[in-house]
Structures are given as C-alpha cells and as structure tokens.
C-alpha cells in the first residue's frame, strides 16, 4: 500500500516537471528566433557592398562654351592610335605655291610714292609704290623709237607694194621693205614688252611696284625717298587662301608615314586642328638631316599664320586601329581614379578609364571610352577644379 501511495504521489510531480521543462524548452526555442531575426535581415544588406560594389554616382559639371574659350580648354576626339605609333614633330606654317609673292623694283631709282602700307589688303594689279628711275625714261624712249621705226617701215612697205602692183619697182624691193617691216615690228614689240614687264608708269619716268596676287601685305621694307636697287625686295604679299604646314621628321620616320594618313596640327596656344598628310619628301636636307612632311588642314581655316611655328602629331602606318589614345593632359585623377571628361550638351561628365602606356605626351586608353568621343584635353584640370568646387549635378 505504501508503494501504491508513493506511485500516486510521484505522477503529479513528474507531470509538473514535464510541464515546466516543456515551457522552458518552448521559450528557449523561440528566444533565438526572435533575436536572430533582425540579424538575419540585416546581414544580407551588410554583405551587398562586398559582393557587388555600388558604383559612385557620376556628376556632370555644367560649363558654358564661352568659358571653354576663355579658359582655353580644348576638346578633341579620342584617337584610334596606339601609344608609340604617333610622332610629335616641330613644323612651320607656309604659304601654298603661288599664294605668296615677293614684290621687287624692276629698276633702280628713288621711291617717289608709297601707296600701300603693312597690313593693307590688296588686289592683283594694285600699285603699291612708284620708283622714279632714269632707266624708266630710257625704256620709254626705246619704246617710242621702236614704235616710230615700225610705223615708218609699214609706210615704206605699203608704198613699195603699191609700186610693185603698178609695175614700177621690182619684187626684190617690195620683199626688202617687207623684211624691214618685220624687223621693226619685232623691235617695237620687244621694247613694249620690256616696258610692260617693268610696269612703266604713264608719265614715262617712273616704274610702278605692282602686286601680282590678291592678299595682305605681310612685309614692307620701303621708305619714301630712299634709293632702291633693281630686284630689291620692297613688299611681301600673302594670299588669303589655304596654307600648308611643313613638319620636320627624321629619315627613319619617313618610312612610317604615308600620304593621306590623319594628322593633328597643334597651334602655339595648344588648340588642335584636324589635318592630313599631303606628301612626304624622299630626301633629307639641312644640317639637321631631316625630311619634310607636308600637312594640310582638313578644313579651311584662318587660324594658321604664314611663318608661325606649330607642332604636328603624325600617325604612323603601323598604328593599331583597335587601340585608343588621348593627350596625356586629358587624363585626370578624380577621387583616386583615372578619368576622362567626356563632352556633353551642357558641360562634361567624368568617365572612369583604364590607362595603359604613357609615352610621348600621349596616354593609351584600354577601356572606358570609345573612339571619336569628344573629351577635354588641354587644361582639363580646370574642368576637374570646377567639379571639385561642387558645380556638378548629382544624378
């Protein structure tokens, strides 16, 4: 009976312990879930930057075109050329054959009148100055004498021809008169040609200094009243038409340059002009032993002045069409990254790029931009400065 009583007492205790254990187990089972739930929702968010870095928002800095001109910021297309396949050569702007004239005096004498001055625009045939010369008087006299002899010979021939028709004189006299007429006319033509080529003035005692082409007077070395010698340069006139650029390259580089290839003319202020190679001389000249590469602008321009010193960037025949390059000044460091400032409608947008080789003032672009895209080159750091001032628009 004692055993039965104990057995009846223990069952309620066991049931109570089981109930307490169940309650504790249930709470323990739910407690980690409730504490773990916020962590589980936050962990993916914390791991996102590690698995897929978020690209910083690119800014566009708005720069008006007037500021570009004032700040001398150049914009050039990304070139399809590998670094090391471009040649940067010194060059000089020259006039095309026939577009520049050196004007001289055709006779010795004193300058009587100066009718044009440095910088004036002239037309072909305009008189620039008059030179009072004894030679002019001599040419005028010879022309008159020759013309008088020709007139006399013509009258003599007409008379002899009439007498021959009448049967008064023999044929020999008429033929002699005809020969004398031919000689006199030839002499008159020679005297007239000499006077015309010397630009003999109508007064018969001075010669005119005449411009043979239309253009602008670029040099003047004449003074009123000064004595000038024959063939002495008095004026220089340059035509207002096209010009060419003559670049000096080494003999080894001539085989790498072909006519028709692309080139870029860099002005004294750094502004670029698209151009192409017109010709390459097959020989070297001068003490420097250099060859000449003739480059012509792709479009007519008035920004090239004859005699101006420029630079020419020549692309060689072995250039890799798949490679890209830009002037080294175009690559800027922004927030620790190499970027190019790509031209937009209202300004520039920084474009991260991967830069390869840098050589000869050019930088190889491996990725980030495409050939032909317009980017800031010269003074690109000014665009970077504008962006650092907070002028960009966050997208």
UniProtKB/Swiss-Prot annotation:
It is a single-pass membrane protein. Induction: By nickel. It is found in: Cell inner membrane. The chain crosses the membrane at residues 13-33. Residues 35-55 are annotated as: Disordered. InterPro entries: Co/Zn/Cd_resistance_CzcB-like, CusB_D23, MFP_Cation_Efflux, RND_pump_MFP. It comes from the Bacteria. One of its GO terms (cellular component) is cell envelope. Residues 140-193 form a coiled coil. GO terms for molecular function: metal ion transmembrane transporter activity. Gene3D superfamilies: 2.40.30.170, 2.40.420.20, 2.40.50.100, Helix hairpin bin (1.10.287.470). Keywords: Cell inner membrane, Cell membrane, Cobalt, Coiled coil, Membrane, Nickel, Plasmid, Transmembrane, Transmembrane helix, Transport. Residues 37-50 have a biased composition (Polar residues). GO terms for biological process: copper ion export; plasma membrane copper ion transport. Belongs to the membrane fusion protein (MFP) (TC 8.A.1) family. The products of the genes cnrA, cnrB, and cnrC are likely to form a membrane-bound protein complex catalyzing an energy-dependent efflux of Ni(2+) and Co(2+). The mechanism of action of the CnrCBA complex may be that of a proton/cation antiporter. This is Nickel and cobalt resistance protein CnrB. It comes from Cupriavidus metallidurans (strain ATCC 43123 / DSM 2839 / NBRC 102507 / CH34) (Ralstonia metallidurans).
